[in-house]
Amino acid sequence: MVRSGKNGDLHLKQIAYYKRTGEYHPTTLPSERSGIRRAAKKFVFKDKKLFYVGEDRKQNRLVIVSEEEKKKVLRECHENDSGAHHGISRTLTLVESNYYWTSVTNDVKQWVYACQHCQVAKNTVIVAPKQHLLKVENPWSLVTVDLMGPFHTSNRSHVYAIIMTDLFTKWVVILPLCDVSASEVSKAIINIFFLYGPPQKIIMDQRDEFIQQINIELYRLFGIKQIVISHTSGTVSPMETTPSTIKAFLSKHCADHPNNWDDHLSAVSFAFNVTHLEPTKNTPYFQMFSRNPYMPETSDSLHDVDGDNTSMFAKILDAIKEADEIMENKTTSLGQMENNNLDELNKSKIIVKKKPKQLNPFHLKVGHEVLRQRKNWWKDGRFQSEWVGPCVIDYITESGCAVLRDNTGVRLKRPIKMSHLKPYIRESSEQESLYLLQGSVVADHDYIGLPEIPVGAYQANILVEDATIGIVDNELLTSSKDRELLEYRNTKISPLIDDHSTLEKQTFSLLDSSNQVLEYLS
C-alpha cells in the first residue's frame, strides 16, 4: 500500500532494492520499513526482473517503472492488430493481465481520453440507411425466386428446382435445374421472362456475390441491369414470401417420383394456381388473368371409365386440394386450441370479490366513546398499527368523518374516518369505580346544595334515568357489540340501585339520630 503523497515508482524501486539486497533503500523512511516488508512478500525476482505475484502468488505480472515502458505497454494494449482502439475497461484488463505499476488505472484513463483517434470516433455518428419497402401494387411487378434441392437425379439429369412466385397474385412457376450455378439459374429466369415478361424486381435469399453474378448473366442475356436484389435488405415484408405449402408438397412429390419428378413440375404449378388461397378467396389464376380457366370438374375427362387409371394431373390436383384442406384444418384447430386455452385460463382465474367499504360498521354516533386506529407506526423494525384512546365523538362531518375529543376534552386536529374507529368497552373494575365515584360526588353535592331532596332518592332517580336511556338506546342501536355493552351496563346498574336504596335508609337513620341529639341538647 503506497502512502498518500508518495511516488509510486519510488515505492517499487524500494521494494526491488529490498528483494535484491535484503536491505532498505537509502530513501526509505523508518516509518515505511514495515510497509516495505509486507509489500515485498507479493513480489519475486525472475531472470533479474521483478514480477508481481499477489497474495495468492498465482499472478505473474511484470513490474513497469519507467515512463517509456508504460507508454509502450499502453499503446500495445489500447490498439489491436486490426487498427481498432479498445475502451477503458478492455484496455485496463489487457494491461493488468500482464503488467503492474501503482497508478495503472489512472494512466489507462488518461491515455484513452487523450487518444485522438478515439475522440474522433466517439463524435462520429453513423446513420443507418432507411429501409424502403417495395409496394406490391400490380401483378408480376415483384417476384421471389427460391431454389430447392438437391432431389433424386431424374431421367433428364435434373437435380434442383427453381420456384418463382408473384407476390401480388401468388402465381407460381416451377422449372427444373441441372445445377444451381449462376448461368443455369439465369437461363431459367430468362425462359420465364419470355413467357410473362420481366418484373420490376426479383428478390432472392442468397449471398450477395451469387446475386451479383446472376445480375451480370441477366444483363448479358437480356440486357437488364440490377434486377435481382437480396432478401436480407428488408425491401419486402416477411409475410410476403413463397407459401410453405408449395415447398412441402414439392419435396414430397419429388420423393414419391424420384425418376420423373421434373416432368410434373408444370402440372404442380398449374394445380397450385387454380386452387383457392387465403385471404382473398380468389385463385392466383384469376388474380393474374382476371378470369378462371375452364376446368371440366363435372365431366369424367380427367378420369377414365374404369376409375383406376386416373390422369397424373388429376392426382396432383386432388393431392394439392387435400394438402390445402389439411393446412386449413391445422390452422383452424390451432385457432380453436388457442381460444380454448384462453377460455381455460380465464376460467382458472380466481375472481376475488372485494368487500364493500363499511363507512360506519359499528353505527357510531355523537357522544360514543371510541378507540382510534393509529397506522404506520414504526416499532421493532417494522410498521405497526395500534388502537389508542379512549376518545369521544364530538360531531360527524358531511363526508362521514368523526371529529374527536380526547379524555381531557381537547379536540383533535384532524377528522378520523369512521372505519378507523371502534367502540371503547370498559372493563368491569373501571365501570364500578366510575359509578362509585360518581355516586359519592353526587351525594356530597346534593347534601350541601339540595337538602330538601333525599340523597338516596336523587341518586336512584339518576341511575334509573340512565337505565331508561340505555333501554332507549338499545332500541336505536343495531350492532351486536352495542347490545352486549348495554346489557352489561344494565346488569351493573341494578345492584347499584339496590345498594343506593340501602344507603338511603342508613342516611335517614343517621339524620333522625342527629335530630334527637339536638333536641336533647336544646
Swiss-Prot record:
Residue ranges annotated for the Integrase catalytic domain, each copy included: 135-292
Segments forming a coiled coil: none
Pfam families tied to this protein: Integrase_H2C2 (PF17921)
GO terms for MF: nucleic acid binding
BP GO annotations: DNA integration
Name used for this protein in its record: Gypsy retrotransposon integrase-like protein 1
Species of provenance: Macaca fascicularis (Crab-eating macaque)
